[in-house]
Amino acid sequence: MRIVIVGAGKLGYSIAELLSQEEYDIVVIDKEEKQLGNIKENLDVLTIAANGSSPITMDNPDVQGADMLIAVTGSDEVNMVCCILAKKHG
């Protein structure tokens, strides 16, 4: 199962850590390279430095085939847009 997590802050990191231990295929998206660096160093997950609320990001082949999207950015509006885009992109 492929799970996309938008937001690489504390909550996104914790979710990615837990799910990667369960052998899920995890993709973490965040605009901030610094946030992604910590995840790259410590977890066996794919990271994408991009805007999670962009249709271009949702068209990425690593994102398109996802079974689930979890949006945990610091903005409710961004989280909602991410979820709407994910639903539209399948």
What are these regions (language model features)?
Residues M1-G90:
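Cytosolic regulatory regions of ion transport systems
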